[in-house]
A protein has these predicted regions:
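Walker A/P-loop NTP-binding motif
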Residues: 45-51
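Walker A/P-loop nucleotide-binding motif
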Residues: 23-44
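Conserved NTP-binding/hydrolysis module of P-loop NTPases
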Residues: 51-52, 61-92
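Conserved AAA+ ATPase "sensor/coupling" helix adjacent to the nucleotide-binding pocket
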Residues: 73-74, 189-200
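A short hydrophobic beta-strand->loop->alpha-helix junction that borders the nucleotide-binding pocket
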Residues: 33, 53-63, 156
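Conserved beta-strand scaffold positions in the cores of enzyme catalytic domains, especially
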Residues: 30, 52-55, 174-178
């Protein structure tokens, strides 16, 4: 059961604020709020489940490459179409060169896939990602949002959000949507709407 709410201090609903944020190129949308407050459901309502590519911060506890992780999620091959090697390089140098080529191929293909298919990356529970990955993700997103890549980062308040909010490279490039705790009357609306859909009468 979904209940639309007005964003505190504005005349807009949370849905309208998210729509406005996603319509602005070059900005990263950052949604922060307590657990079970409807942050992910808000994204589903505005973006649509079919257009969302959802990743969790926990997905990067083992996956150390941001773009490879997303590429796997959407089914993009990590292998470069052509792998070049030169006899002038040692085996170690050849391996390094090939990995670098694969990295850029994966990154470019992921960006193209998202733009061509109008997909939006929703990175949920960002605080679960290891600190070093949080910083890397922040740097990666800072670079690609300028290219039309759409992303929403979802996290808890006062947790590990330093990599996003306090990253100097993202200063002026973040649109923050803070979700307030539920009010009693809003919870009552959820119950009333749910009972109505279930055709259950309440006194």
């Amino acid at each position: 059961t979904y209940v639309s709410r007005e964003s505190k201090g504005t005349k807009y609903t949370y849905e309208e604020r998210l729509q406005q944020s996603l319509a602005i190129d070059g900005y990263l949308t950052y949604i922060v709020g307590p657990s079970k407050i409807g942050k992910t459901v808000l994204c589903e309502k505005v973006i649509g489940a079919a257009n969302m590519v959802c990743m969790s911060g926990n997905d990067f506890s083992k996956e150390k490459d941001f773009w490879s992780g997303i590429g796997k999620k959407v089914g993009i091959s990590m292998e470069a179409a052509v792998s070049e090697k030169s006899a002038a390089f040692s085996d170690k140098e050849q391996k390094s060169m090939t990995v670098t080529k694969n990295y850029f191929v994966t990154k470019d293909r992921v960006i193209d896939y998202f733009k061509e298919n109008e997909k939006v990356l929703v990175l949920d529970d960002f605080h679960y990602a290891p600190p070093e990955m949080q910083y890397d993700i922040a740097c990666q997103l800072k670079e690609v949002i300028r290219m039309g890549f759409k992303a929403v980062v979802v996290s808890l308040p006062y947790r590990s959000d330093d990599a996003i909010r306090l990253n100097p490279d993202l200063t002026g490039r973040i649109l923050v949507i803070e979700i307030d705790p539920w009010k009693t009357e809003e919870l009552e609306q959820i119950a009333q709407k749910g009972f109505k859909e279930l055709q259950i009468e309440i006194d």
